[in-house]
């Protein structure tokens, strides 16, 4: 008993000495020394107890060594974890690791799990760091359940970078969280722009891993194949954060790994094609979408909105009008079984035998979807179970027809919409258009539409005639007003009235009508806005970009380059999309040297202030220069991204480097370089290795 009391006194002295030390480094050293002393003293006590036990116990083989500090510290960790005391558990773990290394796998798993349940970013980061440390120093495979819980907790706490680190660790071992859990992880990651960058890159890595496993006929391939929900979450985020080029790359992965695009996918793909100006790609979906049944019409409002927007961007009023008429038709009320089966839509040229074809199922919606697609409502709205034109879309149509002098075609369109919407008698659309033209003093245009409606057997009401007559009178256009007055008398609108009485009535009607619409945001306001706004990108640019895209998809890069060279000759400024198409085309053929030439053009355009390169294009350039071994260009792009505060996914760049150039110049010293070119390249390679944290 005295011996045990002395041990306790000695232990208290050592701990008190540790607590009284003010220097942190000294405290650590003292604590480590104290723990070793405890181990020695406790072992001596245990030995004495054993000797006594041997003399008094007939079964000495049952001797227990629970008195060691190993067990004491393990017990402290266990107790602290049960009591959810993370500070104490972490301190005890560090003490244990300094003396004995890592604790047992089960205890280590409990610690990681308890840290994962914390909502404090501090402890979540500790958990992530611990996992990486274990993988680096301990030859043990951490159970995927621990990593799954941790990745979800990190994502929920808006820590996408460490969350992706854990996911990538799992992917390296060809293991991923269950798909429904991965949905949630990605859902939380893509709430932020940086999270979307990382999630999209991680999806690319999953697809690469899946393709590699499939080639090797690996059974794990089925477990890591991403589904349409993962694609939808990432693509929707690309739309929200305007990552159009990245979105295009993700879309092309779907047919490569055999993922079917559902109704949500199609809607999101439509928005990405709109952002990229790829009208021809979107038109390929139209025949399939036109055949969907009435219950799905609301869902595809965004599809028609995007396609109509592209028609306007291409200044194709005839196609816009045709699309509008298609929208106003009667939709089939019954679901069609054939639209619930996969259908193939080609990507790029239809004539390419080796071209990609994406599978779509227009009437497939996942019941347990966690995605809520919120498209914009700019041109097409949904009212009373039907798709209808917004005032903005109508203003664009009026502007387009007026610019090309085809008012009669506008009148025909308005009349057709009336007939197709089954509201011929009560529709106010033509009169709204005429009123808007009158407010903008486009009196000739208003009169032309009025005449067209009259000739088609659908004359306007007296109020519309009176408004136009009053406008003529105010503008002192007496010849036109007299002609209109004859029309009014012929139509029986002003019988047995003198001209003076007609003028008085018309002016009075016009005043009353203006007062009624004074506070109403109407078509005229949208027309004024449309006329004052110039197209951000001239229609001809979209035409050129479409041609370049077509040639690149057909692997006709020489024709694509010729088309690109014609742009400055015609004084047309290339856009980011122009360079995206070119770089993507050259990359598909692994023509990395040609990409360096395009990069030179891009730099000249940036220096002149005519171009701002997007983050997704910058990253794509960086990866291609890395694959081609152009490290000077790699560091240039990195410098550009730093200068513009763009997030850089170092994990991905590091992985790409190690895959392609792991031993490049690893042992070569600058003094041993044979040429100046090799010396400079060595310098850039070392700079890159240092930047991504290799060596």
Predicted ranges, named:
Residues 1-695:
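A basic, Ser/Thr-enriched alpha-helical scaffold prevalent
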